[in-house]
Amino acid sequence: MDNPFSKFTNSRTIQADLSLLEENYIPDSFPHREKQINDMVTILSSIMRNSRPSNIIVYGKTGTGKTSTTKYVTRMLQEATSNVEVIYVNCEIYDSPYSILVYVANFAGGEKIPELGWPVDRIYREAVDRINGTGKFFVIVLDEMDRLIKKSGGDSLYVLLKLMTDVENVKVSMIGITNDTTLLENLDSRIKSRLNQESIVFPPYNATEIRDIIASRLEKVFGPGVVDDTAINLCAAIGAQEHGDARKAIDLMRIAIEIAIRENRLKVTEKEVYEARDKYEMNVMHEAINTLPIHSKIVLLSAIVTQEIEPNSVITGEIYENYRRICEDLGFTPLTPRRISDLLTELSDYGLIVVDERNMGKYGRTRGFSVVKEIETIKKYLMEDENLSMFKTSKMTKQARFDS
């Protein structure tokens, strides 16, 4: 029997190092980000003169190169001097004063501090002492800083800014990365007065710029002629339509190449890109639904039920009534109507439902909702949650066509 893997090592298949297209890959060049790199280097160069640099706030939408550029510049800084430590903090994971202080203190060295159990003031003193003991500059990078502030207000940021002034033997500065240009507007004066920041803006890429970025990556993946120019242009156009998202364009190209390899095709064309787009959108939807809190899933389920039972009455009140019934069937305590309205807005932000204003005559205006894409797929993904699987035995199932 022939080895079933041999077809993937055949010399006539596409050979490519797709790790160069992964999200965590940091390239050694950043087309169309020369100004942002120069601005960041100029600010951080104070470290080379033994001075503390200004704090930096990096603004830009998803896929505009904020994080990868920051990682590149800080890596270059560490190559230029051994007297600096860079702490990269993912604020999706570390989103409270306690968790950030523990992470920073443990990074600075010494016996590992437990993630729970210590008073915050003790951890704070430990972090200050440990950083002081290194004798080095510290640059703390807060990626997705908006999550930190929305979760804990300005408390976490205030603690870090206070830490910067309380260390005596070393100098600490911060780089905050966010896609929210209004993030700092509502912070109180005690934080704003300490922040002393300079801003660097990463504007959305246009299609031509994204094309250049993809082409520069592909040069390192394999030689010319493997990917049609039309395929590169299509990926770039799709990324440009998504508010200049180069990350999505690169992901599409990676998936298109994977499809070509699996199908034993010798070239990547528009056909593979269209297939990649469909697969990408399904993956994004699956991930979005899979990570929703349980009540958000029930609200989405309720919107589908309402739409399939009474398509002309998909309004907040009707959705809430079905939500309440489903909660009772599944053994969950319903949230308030106001909270459900907020969850509907969040589902709209995810692109899982569409919101429109409806005129109810003498009753005023209300919000209407619709689930307009891949309803059967959304049902399937929702039913993967064991907490919702009992819905298939609910009396509402047949009306909502979940019994197939």
Swiss-Prot record:
InterPro entries linked to this entry: AAA+_ATPase (IPR003593), AAA_22 (IPR049945), Cdc6_C (IPR015163), Cdc6_lid (IPR055237), ORC1/CDC6 (IPR050311), Orc1/Cdc6_arc (IPR014277), P-loop_NTPase (IPR027417), WH-like_DNA-bd_sf (IPR036388)
GO MF entry, a single one: ATP hydrolysis activity
Binding site for ATP: T64, G65, K66, T67, S68, Y205, R217
Pfam family, one: AAA_22
Keywords: ATP-binding, DNA replication, Nucleotide-binding
Signal peptide: none
Keyword Hydrolase part of the UniProt annotation: no
Superkingdom of the source species: Archaea
Gene Ontology process terms (BP): DNA replication
Similarity-based family: Belongs to the CDC6/cdc18 family.
PANTHER family assigned: CELL DIVISION CONTROL PROTEIN 6-RELATED, ORC1-TYPE DNA REPLICATION PROTEIN
Entry function: Involved in regulation of DNA replication.
Identification of the protein by name: ORC1-type DNA replication protein
The species this protein was found in: Thermoplasma volcanium (strain ATCC 51530 / DSM 4299 / JCM 9571 / NBRC 15438 / GSS1)
